[in-house]
């Protein structure tokens, strides 16, 4: 899981990640309190390099507030988290 770009961002950021073998991939956004904000990926993917976009909105389409968010990927045994900053 690479660092998102741009960071800080407004209104959109890109998140790049790679998986070395086919795996169930979960890529989720959390706020600083640990609450789930959005789910970007939740499916099985073949090995490869991927780029996902987060539009700074929650699962209901509401604009997320300015602040720190965490992007967490789980793919097989891989678990990584990166910090992102949304500036409105």
Question: Locations of the language-model features?
Answer:
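Extracellular and select intracellular beta-sandwich modules with Ser/Thr-enriched
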Residues: 78-82
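Conserved Rossmann-like nucleotide-cofactor binding loop
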Residues: 35
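Short beta-strand edge segments in extracellular beta-sheet folds
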Residues: 84-88
């Amino acid at each position: 899981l690479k660092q998102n770009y741009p960071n800080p961002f407004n209104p959109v950021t890109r998140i790049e990640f790679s998986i070395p073998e086919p795996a169930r991939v979960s890529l989720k956004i959390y706020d600083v309190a640990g609450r789930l904000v959005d789910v970007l990926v939740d499916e099985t993917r073949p090995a490869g390099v991927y780029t996902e976009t987060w539009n700074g909105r929650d699962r209901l389409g509401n604009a997320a507030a300015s602040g720190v968010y965490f992007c967490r990927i789980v793919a097989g045994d891989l678990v990584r988290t990166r910090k992102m900053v949304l500036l409105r």
